[in-house]
Amino acid sequence: MYTSRLLFAPVATALLAAAPALAQQQDFSKVQMTTVKVTEGVYMLTGAGGNIGVSAGEDGVFLIDDQYAPLTDKIKAAVAAISKKPIRFLLNTHWHGDHTGGNENLGKAGVLIVAHENVRKRMTTEQFIQAFGQKTPPSPKDALPVVTFTDAVTLHLNGDEIQAFHVAPAHTDGDAVVHFRKANVVHAGDLFFNGIYPFIDVDSGGSVDGMIAAADRILGVTDDRTQIIPGHGPLSHRAGLQSFRTMLAVARDKIQPLVDQGKTVEQVVAAAPTKELDEQWGKGFLTPDQFVRIVYSSMKKRPAGGGGGSR
């Protein structure tokens, strides 16, 4: 445990603001929701926390993620400016509080919450993320998903076939990708941090290998016209996700030999293995050193005999 605390201590400072238990300490009064029209009937909302996806049409409103509880009224106002129809469904792409913080408010309002079964499992039990040094207590009943799935679930709404499918553990063990088949839009959740190094929740089963494999799954359902809503960062496309995937693979392949040599995390960080990537990717909420620590940790937690995934 002492080694783990040392490993993640530098990460905690950058990420504490996103820890669910500390969300109440943030000043959300100044947060403004911004609406981006992705295509007819599909929108992206940005504010604080993960990007929100919106499907609006004759059948009502379907939300993907809901940021933090204090922002629920602002989210509702942004949705009302798009559609006068009620919010009927909410899907959580994973369990983290910057994507599920509004669940309780929406659940109490009668919104049906959907997620992968591991999201509900984690939300019903205490969680501890080393990077935050933060315990998250079980969520209240109204915040929990009431419909769960294992592999995939499809919603036939607003003239589209909207499929949410699970990927093998990547950012967490409960990640879901939402594919609007007709609109040709994908909400990738935190499987895609556009333009910045991603946080990978190793304590929730995440890994750099899983992130790369998840990017490949998403690329497999997209084409050059697909628009991709990332978990964090601006609206993107297939080329943007491919660039993110390439970065992850390069970082892994630079760090892997150092891990194989038995280097300590401090020695790996000192070697600056991501220096060729840092100018483009290292200016987000994770510094290059923090990202290297996370990748190192995910490699050290691989099962015996496990190696790198696809190239």
Please annotate each region the language model reported.
Residues T34-V79, A176-F180, N184-A188:
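Conserved beta-strand hairpin/beta-sheet module of binuclear metal-dependent hydrolase folds
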Residues K37, G60-V61, Y68-P70, R120-V167, T172-D173, R181-K182, ...:
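Metallo-beta-lactamase
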